[in-house]
Design a protein with these regions (language model features):
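An amphipathic, aromatic/His-enriched active-site/gating alpha helix that lines ligand/cofactor pockets
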Residues: 30-33, 54-79
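Hydrophobic/aromatic beta-strand elements that line small-molecule binding cavities or substrate pockets
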Residues: 37-38
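Short S/T/G/P-rich N-terminal loop/turn motif that feeds into the first structured element of a domain
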Residues: 1-32, 41-45, 56, 78-88
Length: 88
């Protein structure tokens, strides 16, 4: 599966940490997409996550099914950590 970097603008006060936890857990149970990593700042209404799926359309369909707003879904070509960059 490919990795997709997703950005979200969350309506202020609409999402709690528990709701985001439920989204993350649901992504682990789905047959089409898998959650890989998430970052969020609820006070500023911003979140970024990395999802694994066969294609961008599967990720978009999953977000729509779950009622999770999203701004962008971008296929990850390179990833890195602590100065090491490699193909995704």
């Amino acid at each position: 599966m490919a990795k997709f970097m997703c950005t979200h603008t969350l309506p202020a006060g609409k999402f709690s940490s528990e709701q985001l936890r439920q989204f993350a857990q649901a992504a682990q149970q789905d047959a089409t997409v898998k959650g890989y990593r998430s970052f969020a700042n609820l006070a500023e209404g911003r979140a970024v996550c990395v999802m694994e799926a066969q294609n961008k359309d599967e990720v978009a369909a999953w977000f729509q099914k779950m009622g999770m707003p999203f701004d962008t879904i971008t296929k990850v070509e390179l990833e890195g950590e602590r100065g090491n960059i490699h193909a995704a």
